[in-house]
Amino acid sequence: MKALLRALIGQGIEALRANGTLPGDTLPPDFVVERPKTREHGDFATNAAMLLAKAARSNPRALAQALLTALPDSNDVTKVEIAGPGFINFHLAPTAYQREVAHVIKQGHDYGRGLAGNGRSVGVEYVSANPTGPLHVGHGRAAAIGDSLARVLDANGWNVKREFYYNDAGVQIENLALSVQARAQGLTPDSAGWPENGYRGDYIADVANAYLTGDTVDMEGHLVTGTKDPADLESIRRFAVAYLRNEQNHDLAAFRVDFDIYFLESSLYKDGKVEEAVQKLIASGHTYEEGGALWLKSTDFGDDKDRVMRKSDGTYTYFVPDVAYHLTKWQRGYERAITELGADHHGSLTRVRAGLQAMELGIPQGWPEYVLHQMVTVMRDGEEVKLGKRAGGYVTLRDLIEETSADAVRWFLIARKPDSQLTFDIDLARAQSNDNPVFYVQYAHARVCSVLRQAQEKGYKYDQVHGLAELARLDDEHSLAVMLELSRYPEVVEIAGQTLEPYQIAQYLRELAHAFHTWYHNSKVLVDDAAERDAKLTLAVATQQVLANGLELLGVSAPEKM
């Protein structure tokens, strides 16, 4: 519908150029066509006249009137009016919305998919949990947001690569190995010889037992076997990392999250990428030495103070491999790089960008882009869920999935803006009622499937071609409300991709489900009149399709029965 209105406005602008109202060399402005906040202001509004007023040396409202007069007639537009300082509001005919139903039916799974990305490459990194323990609910929120964002970008025509960065070379891995070794030697977290910064969760005992019994872990095609030797710290380190990565991948698979690339921090050192990044920074002239340490002049690039890159003992600070890692993303040809992180990592953003800018390689400012999520509080029976002993102090993603479902967990972890704190109510997530938003939306999809089964059981032969031809019969308030919501879907997908906010898909699906349930309760679908029945079934099938398309972007199933 936006394309139709943009075409009409474009023709109106050409008419104003032809009659001299606008100078002949006036270029069409980058005007917007958007839905007003309230339906009283029409179905769509444009600011075209306000943008052209200066070129026309005219008052914006006067130019809006001229443009309104110059617009070609369209059977899909019932009224055009001027509002405010020069907005032009369009009221559409039911035929415009009825035609959108036909578009849904024709395009099917592709309805809502766009070409904004035009096949360009984008790398989306998310989760990137240290392989030192089970995934917790915060990792779950990162997984849900990141995976859905990747799906939304793919739907907008981007060539998406999903990436998981393993911090397998830091001090946390050393602490993990020491913790597993201590368990293998018979110590407990309360023992006097327990490592000072050791991990205390019961899962450490699971890793140690698997190592001592000589278990073999298949880590993405590489077999790692426990050597049973509690004194062999290096073997323990390799086995523990493989074991916990395998556990994390198991949870992610259950959560319907997968990746194209698993990138190991250790490979940055092995392949010389950290040293390469450091040498590029030195060569650019944005480093200096002081107190035996190598510093980055990060204040030249918006940081609040310069940062140490290499300490006096020769080791690198933690942000240097982060810079090196993102340099590889640039070298791998990502036009865009998006990193989803917990809000507690906010301080690293400026440093990483400063390091990349300081290399003077033509990397754009603001690259990579970041999506930050806030923490999650888990509630049951009105009280916060106590921290899990197995995980050593947090609620695991596996716990939530087992208590509710992957569908419910994904929905609730996506359904709010990432930068807002989130309360996950286990009781609500399990509820089979309209108060549960994921149930409410899935039930709308299942309800259509049920109606189609009932039609078959009653011996009604559904003729979709006939239904499309008879959509003009559906001009009542509730039918048009469903059609209006269906027409919004491509815009919502596009906006979610532009803003990197997949939660907008969830919000939209609730509104579509509400419109559908309201229509269903106020309109008998399986009526005796075949023309009316086919038209209503066609509207229901179109709704089913859009619900399925949107749920797929969230990684949530679209059940046929509930």
UniProtKB/Swiss-Prot annotation:
- Give the superkingdom in one word: Bacteria
Which family is this sequence assigned to? Belongs to the class-I aminoacyl-tRNA synthetase family.
Keywords, in A-Z order: Aminoacyl-tRNA synthetase, ATP-binding, Cytoplasm, Ligase, Nucleotide-binding, Protein biosynthesis
Give the Enzyme Commission number: 6.1.1.19
Primary location group: cytoplasm
**Which class of enzymes does this protein belong to?**
ligase
Q: Which Gene3D superfamilies match?
A: Arginyl tRNA synthetase N-terminal domain, HUPs, Isoleucyl-tRNA Synthetase, Domain 1
- Record's SMART domains? Arg_tRNA_synt_N (SM01016), DALR_1 (SM00836)
Instruction: Report the residue ranges where the short sequence motif 'HIGH' region is annotated in this entry.
Output: 129-139
State the organism named in the record: Xanthomonas oryzae pv. oryzae (strain KACC10331 / KXO85)
The answer to whether keyword Nucleus applies is no
Q: Which PANTHER family match?
A: ARGININE--TRNA LIGASE, CYTOPLASMIC, ARGINYL-TRNA SYNTHETASE
* Gene name of this polypeptide: argS
A Pfam family that the UniProt record links to this protein: tRNA-synt_1d
Q: How does it assemble?
A: Monomer.
> What biological-process GO terms show up in the record?
arginyl-tRNA aminoacylation
State what protein this is by name. Arginine--tRNA ligase
Q: GO terms for CC?
A: cytoplasm
Q: Which PROSITE patterns match?
A: AA_TRNA_LIGASE_I (PS00178)
The entry lists its GO molecular-function terms as: arginine-tRNA ligase activity; ATP binding
Query: What is the catalytic activity of this protein?
Result: tRNA(Arg) + L-arginine + ATP = L-arginyl-tRNA(Arg) + AMP + diphosphate
Where does it reside?
Cytoplasm
Q: CDD domains under this entry? A: ArgRS_core
